[in-house]
C-alpha cells in the first residue's frame, strides 16, 4: 500500500507527522505544513486535498509497520517478547499523535474508529497467541481461559494508554516516557512468569 511514494508526498507526510506530534492535531493546518516545507499549498493539495487524508495515510502506515513487526518474530524467549514489545512502543511513539489525540482523530476521520474497533479482535488474537506460545515454551505460567482473557484485555489497555498516561502527568521526554511505562509493565508482567523466567531475568 505504501511502496513507491512520491518524494514530495513523503516529505509532506514526514512534516505532517512531526507537526502533529509536536503541536497536536487540532493545532496544525495544511497551510502550516506547506509553509514549513516552503512549498505552495497548491503543491501540497495535489497530493493531499484534505487534512483527513494525511491523518488516514499515517494511521494505516502505522498499522502496516505493526503487522511487519509481528511477522518478524521467529522464536519465543522472554527476551524475544520484551524486544518485540519495545519495538512496538517505538513505532507507536513515532506516531504518538494518534494516541494522544485519538478522539480528535476519530472525529476528523470517523471511519478510522470503525477500523480501530474491528482490529481489536485481531490484536486480541495476536496477544493470545503470544501468551500461549510463551506458556508452551515455559516462559509464562499456564492460565485458565478467563485469566487469559483478562491478561489480553490488560495488555491491550496498557498499549492504548501508556503515552497519554505519561503526558497527563507531565512526562513528555521520550526516555522518561519509556521508563515510566516499562517500569510498571514489567512489574505487572512478572506475575505471569515461570520461576525459571524470573531466574533468567535476575541474571541480567
What is each model feature region?
Residues 1-7, 201-204:
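N-terminal intrinsically disordered/low-complexity leader segments
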Residues 11, 15, 19-58:
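Helix-turn-helix
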Residues 60-66:
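Short, basic, alpha-helical segments at the C-terminal edge of helix-turn-helix-like DNA-binding modules
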Residues 70-97:
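Hydrophobic alpha-helical connector segments
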Residues 70-73, 99-106, 138, 162-170:
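Secondary-structure edge/capping motif, primarily at the C-terminal ends of alpha-helices
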Residues 100-102, 115, 143:
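Short, hydrophobic secondary-structure boundary micro-motifs
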Residues 111-137, 149-164, 183-187:
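Amphipathic alpha-helical packing segments from all-alpha helical-bundle domains
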Residues 132, 158-204:
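C-terminal peripheral helix-coil segments that are non-catalytic and often amphipathic
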Amino acid at each position: 500500500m505504501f511502496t513507491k511514494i512520491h518524494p514530495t508526498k513523503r516529505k509532506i507526510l514526514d512534516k505532517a507527522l512531526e507537526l502533529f506530534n509536536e503541536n497536536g492535531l487540532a493545532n496544525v493546518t495544511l497551510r502550516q505544513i506547506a509553509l514549513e516545507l516552503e512549498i505552495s499549498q497548491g503543491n501540497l493539495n495535489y497530493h493531499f486535498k484534505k487534512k483527513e487524508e494525511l491523518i488516514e495515510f499515517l494511521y494505516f502506515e502505522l498499522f502496516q509497520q505493526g503487522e511487519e513487526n509481528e511477522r518478524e518474530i521467529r522464536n519465543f524467549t522472554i527476551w524475544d517478547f520484551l524486544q518485540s514489545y519495545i519495538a512496538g512502543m517505538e513505532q507507536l511513539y513515532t506516531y504518538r499523535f494518534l494516541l494522544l489525540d485519538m478522539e480528535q482523530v476519530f472525529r476528523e476521520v470517523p471511519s478510522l474508529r470503525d477500523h480501530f474497533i474491528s482490529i481489536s479482535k485481531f490484536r486480541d488474537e495476536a496477544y493470545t497467541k503470544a501468551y500461549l506460545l510463551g506458556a508452551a515454551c515455559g516462559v509464562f505460567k499456564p492460565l485458565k481461559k478467563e485469566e487469559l482473557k483478562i491478561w489480553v484485555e490488560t495488555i491491550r489497555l496498557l498499549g492504548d494508554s501508556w503515552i497519554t498516561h505519561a503526558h497527563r502527568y507531565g512526562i513528555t521526554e521520550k526516555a522518561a516516557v519509556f521508563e515510566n511505562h516499562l517500569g510498571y509493565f514489567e512489574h505487572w508482567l512478572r506475575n505471569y512468569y515461570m520461576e525459571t523466567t524470573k531466574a533468567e531475568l535476575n541474571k541480567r
